[in-house]
Amino acid sequence: MKKQPQKTLLAIALSVVSGTAMSHGYVSAVENGVAEARVTLCKFAASTGEKNTNCGAIQYEPQSVEGPDGFPASGPRDGKIASAESALANALDEQTADRWVKHPIQTGAQNFEWTFTANHVTKDWKYYITKPDWNPNQPLARASFDLTPFCVVDGGMVQPPKRVSHTCNVPEREGYQVILAVWDVGDTAASFYNVIDVKFDGDGPALPDWQQGGQIIPTMNLNVGDTVFTRVFDLAGENPAYTTELAINSDALTVANNWSHALAVKINQTQSEIAAGQLNEQNQFVPVYGTNPIFLKSGSNLQRVEIGYKIETPAPEYDVTLSGLASEYQISDVPVTLDLSLQATGDITTELIVYNHHKEPLAFESVAMKDGENKAVSMTLSKSEAGHHMLVTKVLDKDGKLQKQQTSDFMLTETQTPPPSNDYDFVFPDGLSSYTAGTKVLASDGAIYQCKPFPYSGYCVQWTPTATQYQPGTGSHWQMAWDKL
């Protein structure tokens, strides 16, 4: 049997872990939705190119903001409404007037669109909006919202299509508001909570003489000695005369949100046809410590603005080399223990989680390591049952951000009674040098294997403790050397 490449096995294993457990839905604007949810903009850019940043792990699973049923009588507690109390989505609970990208909206009929990755039977959808006098610099709580939904759509206890749109009459508001969309699933005791950051701008454009042409997204921290700058394009191409450069000359400026703010300030100080910042209630461009939209003056012939970097130092590498994981472990009267070795590339934290085939977590270890450091780790499984298991290895940088993830498969097998000794010639790898065509050995999995005839019999003796590809039953290419009896 031809062994699948490791990369394919990794993909299959990852899909088993995450594909079924983390597939639900989110508020989108793919077809006719008025605005994307906060979590959606963590993964997908808006039509303006704007995205939310520093969202944590939920940026990889925007469909998974799932929490307890029954809002507002029950459901997520105050301060945890945006995350629905999901640990994946903790960052979504941050709340200030300038933390999140906002989408323009108007009072009256608006379409709200949901995209589903698993279209559960649905009880209903409800839409709430913040009160006119809410405080955008306090965590979202029930007191922030008008707790009478402005729109309720009956789900009929049937499965919706993979994308649905609801036309709702949005109440009159001014400035920055938050809409809470709640999808009440009919076949579980959970609901999905998506907050939508919107800004009411009246019936016409707030600044008709300006159009958005780019944005400053604080995607990464920089180092002292680096430079961040604007690349401005007009009808003829890039025009260096409009460039604004910011030298990163202090530790404070290395922080992503700080240099984004400083670059926006410098643009506003040095440019007359380019402005940066979020538009406030007085129609002023105010630089923020986060994503800063860039606007171009009408009639300037300027087309767009991009952000460039001059990086003086290479980006750090983060990785871990894992060894010691066997492809198979036999179950006995003591719990199965994995004895592993880790070697770090970069200053990292390695998280190791063992799952069985049913995706139950059986063991967890978190190991902080310095660059080049080696550490031994033992993981004792809380349950030992025969079948497929997975070891998920996550590499986090010093800021706790996920840099790499891989999944390794292994099996637990029941202990087998060894066959009679006269059924085999050797217990592998005893007598290795004398193996020839027809030699029978007892392998580590308790089965008997016979060395293949010439010309394959030469593979039977090709084994060392560090080169095990032809080891009967467990090596990556054992079928080239042996027949299982």
Swiss-Prot record:
Main location: secreted
All residue ranges annotated as the Chitin-binding type-3 domain in the record: 437-478
Gene3D superfamilies documented for this protein: 2.60.40.2550, 3.30.70.2150, chitin-binding protein cbp21
Gene Ontology CC: one annotated term: extracellular region
InterPro entries cross-referenced by the UniProt entry: Cellulose/chitin-bd_N (IPR004302), GbpA_2 (IPR041029), GbpA_D3 (IPR054063), GlcNAc-bd_A (IPR020879), GlcNAc_Chitin_IntDeg (IPR051024), Ig_E-set (IPR014756)
Domain of life: Bacteria
Secretion signal span: 1-29
The keyword Signal is assigned to this record: yes
Family named by the database record: Belongs to the GbpA family.
Protein name listed in UniProt: GlcNAc-binding protein A
NCBIfam families recorded: PRK13211.1
CDD domains in the record: LPMO_AA10 (cd21177)
Species: Vibrio vulnificus (strain YJ016)
GO molecular function, one term: chitin binding
